[in-house]
Amino acid sequence: FVLSEIQEFYEVNGLPYTREQLFTDYLKYGGLPMRLVLPDEHSVRTYLEDVYDSVVMKDILSRYAIRNESLLRKLLEFLLDNIGNPFSARSISRSLLSAGQSTTVDTVLNYIDKLQAGMILSKAERYDIKGKNILASTEKYYAGDIGLRNVSKTSEQIDTSKLLENVVYLEMLNRGYEVKVGKLDTQEIDFVCYKGQKKLYIQVAYVLSEDCIDREFGNLEKIDDNYPKYVISSDIVDLSRKGIVHYNIIDFLLDGKDI
C-alpha cells in the first residue's frame, strides 16, 4: 500500500486517524497491508522481521539457489543503509570487501538482480538531462518497502530526508511513472519521471532551510525546458517560486495532487 491506500483502509473500516499519524507510521512501518490489522507496535515489528527473514531472504535464497547467504544479507543491508546514494557495482564490491566480505563485481550485479526480482530493492538509473542518455556507471537504490528497510538490522541512524525520497520514489512508481535519477552537469535532480508523453522533475527535502531552498529550487531552475518541476518537503507553508510548485509531502501523498 501507498499512504492514500492506507488512509482508504482506515476510512472503509471506520477507524480513527490523523493524517500526521498515518504518515509517521508509514515512515516507520511501511505499507505491507497485514501490518494494519495487528494490535500493537511489537506485533507489527515482529511481523516485519518475519517477512524480511523468512519470506524475503529465504525465498530469494531458495528460488535462485544462492549459496552465499552471508553475502546476500550484507549486500542488502548495505544498500538499504544507503538508500538514495549513488553506487556502481564496483564501488559496492569494494565497500563489502573493506567490511570483510569478499566478492566480485559480477556476483554483486547478479545478487542485485535477484533482490530486485524479490521486490525488496528497486534500482533507479541515472539520466543525463543535458545529454538525454542513461549513465551506466552509477545507479541509486531504494527500498521496496520502508518498513522492511527499517527492520533490516541495518544502522539505527535514519536519514529522514532519504526516507522521504524513498517514499516519493515508491509513490511515483505507484502512479505509473518510470522514475530515474537526474544529473545536470555537477548537480543532482532527485527524480526525472516519465509516463507516456508526460515528463516532470522532482526534488525532495525534509525541511527547506534558506540554504536548502536555494539549492533545491536552484537546481530545478537550471533545467532549460518547460516541463513541470516540483519540490516536495515536510514544510507546511507554500514555498513555490518561479513556476516551480512546492508541495507538503502529506498533502502530496493524500490529496491526490496531480503531477
Residue ranges and their predicted role:
Residues 1-7:
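Alpha-helical sensor/transducer elements of the RecA-like P-loop NTPase core
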Residues 8-53:
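Amphipathic alpha-helical "lid/sensor" segments that cap RecA-like P-loop NTPase cores
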Residues 23, 169, 217-221:
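Short amphipathic alpha-helical segments and helix-helix/interface helices
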Residues 36-198:
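Accessory nucleic acid-recognition modules appended to NTPase machines
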Residues 182-183, 206-250:
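Catalytic cores of nucleic-acid endonucleases
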Residues 198-200, 228:
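Structural motif
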Residues 252-259:
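Non-catalytic C-terminal interaction segments of nucleic acid-processing enzymes
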